[in-house]
């Protein structure tokens, strides 16, 4: 079942056209790894999908919630459109490179903030669900600790639990291991592997080629704002058709 469809997505920052017509489909349970050099548009694409950045053109369909970015005044006062964007965002969980936990809240409060104040859940119910999520990511003992008292890996696992707390249809990961010390990377990737095994749909901007090859069922290679190569990881990694993709993977080999 298709849960995400992007057609001709474009994004510019002043005169710099970062996305030049992205087309992408993800089915339920897909793990899509998005690879490419810095500046290719990977993170911008993710941020446009959940409207952290405002696309200039294109159509985004998340589980039947369709927004035509070409015709809409996305930053305007249209209340119906803004409500539609909020509805779309509720279907998407986002995990950032820099964790983005609120430093003045303990981990439990970080996780329950959106369920209580956005979804309208009772605080007690949200806390019980949050504790289960912390157990799922292996840091239940950190529920009442503050982010500054956690390692980078623990903070990112807490951020994954926070993203899961809204029960999203799709998780978006923006280079989730890039800010971690090397010895902490595996604990985060392990959580992501478990989510993949449980059938969570994920789009992952990553430089972790082993994860992309072994966990994903689809890999896309971005270059200069366009998808230049896409397919099953076995094909992309062993027989890429794009010379740029071949060179990128050659330079990333272990």
Regions of interest found by a model, annotated:
Residues 58-72:
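Conserved ABC transporter NBD signature motif
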Residues 146-150, 154:
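Conserved ABC ATPase signature
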Residues 165-169:
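A short, proline-enriched helix->beta-strand linker immediately N-terminal to the Walker B motif
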Residues 171-174:
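Catalytic Walker B motif of ABC-type/P-loop ATPase nucleotide-binding domains
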Residues 182-184:
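Helix N-cap at the start of a conserved alpha-helix in ABC-type nucleotide-binding domains
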Residues 230-231:
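ABC ATPase "signature
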């Amino acid at each position: 079942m298709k849960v995400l469809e992007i057609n001709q997505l474009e994004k510019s920052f002043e005169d710099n056209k970062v996305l030049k017509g992205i087309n992408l489909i993800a089915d339920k349970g897909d793990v899509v790894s998005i690879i490419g050099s810095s500046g290719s548009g990977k993170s911008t694409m993710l941020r446009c999908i959940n409207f952290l950045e405002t696309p200039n053109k294109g159509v985004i369909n998340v589980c039947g919630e369709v927004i035509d970015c070409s015709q809409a005044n996305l930053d305007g006062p249209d209340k119906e459109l803004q409500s539609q964007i909020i509805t779309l965002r509720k279907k998407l969980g986002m995990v950032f490179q820099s964790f983005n936990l609120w430093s003045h809240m303990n981990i439990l409060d970080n996780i329950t903030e959106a369920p209580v104040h956005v979804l309208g859940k009772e605080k007690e119910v949200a806390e019980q669900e949050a504790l289960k999520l912390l157990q799922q990511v292996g840091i239940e003992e950190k529920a009442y600790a503050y982010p500054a008292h956690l390692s980078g890996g623990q903070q990112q696992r807490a951020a994954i639990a926070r993203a899961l707390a809204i029960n999203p249809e799709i998780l978006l990961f923006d280079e989730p291991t890039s800010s971690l010390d090397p010895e902490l990377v595996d604990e985060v990737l392990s959580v992501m592997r478990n989510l993949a095994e449980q059938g969570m749909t994920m789009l992952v901007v990553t430089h972790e080629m082993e994860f992309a090859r072994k966990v994903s069922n689809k890999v896309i290679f971005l270059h200069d704002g366009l998808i230049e190569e896409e397919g099953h990881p076995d094909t992309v990694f062993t027989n890429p058709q794009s010379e740029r993709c071949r060179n990128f993977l050659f330079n990333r080999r272990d």
